[in-house]
Amino acid sequence: MSTFITFEGPEGAGKTSVIKKVSERLAKEYDIVTTREPGGVLTSEEIRRIVLDGDSIDIRTEAMLFAASRREHLVEKIIPSLQAGKIVLCDRYIDSSLAYQGYARGIGIKEVKLLNEFAINGLYPDLTIYLDVDAEIGRQRILKNNREQNRLDKEEKAFHEKVIEGYQKVISDNPHRFIKVNANHSLDKVVEETYQSIIKYLK
């Protein structure tokens, strides 16, 4: 029963924590693989380091690096896992590029979509969970979090607001595969709603 489920949302939405807890519950019934973008495999993790931890990068270079990382991740991990009948839970995928580089960076959603369609070669998610959090709440969570902030975390509030606008545009263009979860709530509540949404989809 191979299924490709992605998780999207702005910085501070809690994707990593939600995926961890949801995957633990799903693993009691299903064969689950969890992964992330950028990253997931060695080559993609190296690209992640360059893009997120390096100095300022040209916005088109940034978009192309994310697409290259995505291609390697697909070929090395996502596609083999799906072919083996597993359920793949992925922290970010093509919609992140559309919202961040396409809309917030101003390259254009259409242009970034074309670039990424070459990379994914038709492999869109079966289901995408969008963790919907207010920009200010997300920003405060980042500041309170002990993890080291990356280059995108450090962007101004206006950038993160544009990311959210970009996601809304992407969702309105693809309503058939998105489920919105209010991520302003407590982690436990978000996890429960996300888990129930996925179970309903799978059954």
Swiss-Prot record:
<keyword id="KW-0808">Transferase</keyword>
<comment type="similarity">
    <text>Belongs to the thymidylate kinase family.</text>
</comment>
<dbReference type="Pfam" id="PF02223">
    <property type="entry name" value="Thymidylate_kin"/>
</dbReference>
<dbReference type="GO" id="GO:0005524">
    <property type="term" value="F:ATP binding"/>
</dbReference>
<dbReference type="GO" id="GO:0006227">
    <property type="term" value="P:dUDP biosynthetic process"/>
</dbReference>
<dbReference type="InterPro" id="IPR018095">
    <property type="entry name" value="Thymidylate_kin_CS"/>
</dbReference>
<comment type="function">
    <text>Phosphorylation of dTMP to form dTDP in both de novo and salvage pathways of dTTP synthesis.</text>
</comment>
<protein>
    <recommendedName>
        <fullName>Thymidylate kinase</fullName>
        <ecNumber>2.7.4.9</ecNumber>
    </recommendedName>
</protein>
<feature type="binding site">
    <location>
        <begin position="9"/>
        <end position="16"/>
    </location>
    <ligand>
        <name>ATP</name>
    </ligand>
</feature>
<dbReference type="InterPro" id="IPR018094">
    <property type="entry name" value="Thymidylate_kinase"/>
</dbReference>
<dbReference type="GO" id="GO:0006233">
    <property type="term" value="P:dTDP biosynthetic process"/>
</dbReference>
<dbReference type="GO" id="GO:0004798">
    <property type="term" value="F:dTMP kinase activity"/>
</dbReference>
<keyword id="KW-0547">Nucleotide-binding</keyword>
<keyword id="KW-0418">Kinase</keyword>
<dbReference type="GO" id="GO:0005829">
    <property type="term" value="C:cytosol"/>
</dbReference>
<keyword id="KW-0067">ATP-binding</keyword>
<dbReference type="InterPro" id="IPR039430">
    <property type="entry name" value="Thymidylate_kin-like_dom"/>
</dbReference>
<dbReference type="GO" id="GO:0006235">
    <property type="term" value="P:dTTP biosynthetic process"/>
</dbReference>
<keyword id="KW-0545">Nucleotide biosynthesis</keyword>
<dbReference type="InterPro" id="IPR027417">
    <property type="entry name" value="P-loop_NTPase"/>
</dbReference>
